[in-house]
Amino acid sequence: MLKKFLISCLFIFLVACGNDSTQQFYGSDISAANLDASFSLTNHHGERATLDSYKNKVIAVFFGFTNCPDICPTSLQELKYIKQELGQAGNNFQVLFISLDPERDTQEKLSLFIPSFDPTFIGLYGSSNEVDAMANQYKVFHQKVEQGDSYTIDHSSGIYLIDRSGKIRIRHPYGSPVEGIIADIQQLLSESI
């Protein structure tokens, strides 16, 4: 009788705990949107780069432009801090900065700007059509806004995390606590491919 009772209690305990495979992230889990992570752009070294160039790494994607006065450099500085906090695990983490300003963000300009945050960060650029296509894939708003003889670019800002199998999984809006971003990256790094 006691044995049946214990088995029943164990069964109830296991059912109550459940086998909930849903993962909890600090950022927004956008995996259900099935966004296309693929790309083919030129990196700041002048080489063509695709998603496969960063195979088996967790990737943080940020869209911005080098003349951005505040949000872009702040986000890149946070990503630098995040990479440092990851320690050795940071070797399996890649930051990609996608330029939304194909007119001004040349290879030369990106090759000076991006490494000033971290030498492992990669700046990517392309033609207007290539950049627009990639921004559309990621649902990133961007618009050129004239300002006297120059212009700025209004854009949505956030960090997209791509898992090691190449799927866009998480989006952290601008201003998200870095501790949450670090925890999400660590969780993605711990997943089997």
What do the predicted segments below correspond to?
Residues 2-8:
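Sec-dependent signal peptide recognition
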Residues 13-16:
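C-terminal motif of bacterial Sec signal peptides marking the signal peptidase cleavage site
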Residues 22-52, 77:
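N-terminal "domain-start" segment that seeds a small globular fold
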Residues 51-73, 79:
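Short active-site neighborhood of thiol/selenol oxidoreductases, capturing the structured segment around
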Residues 57-58, 74-98:
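Conserved helix-turn-beta segment immediately C-terminal to the redox Cys motif
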Residues 92-105, 120-129:
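Thiol-based oxidoreductase modules, predominantly thioredoxin-like and allied folds used
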Residues 111-156:
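Short, internal strand/loop/helix patches
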Residues 147-193:
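Thiol-/selenol-based redox modules, centered on thioredoxin-like
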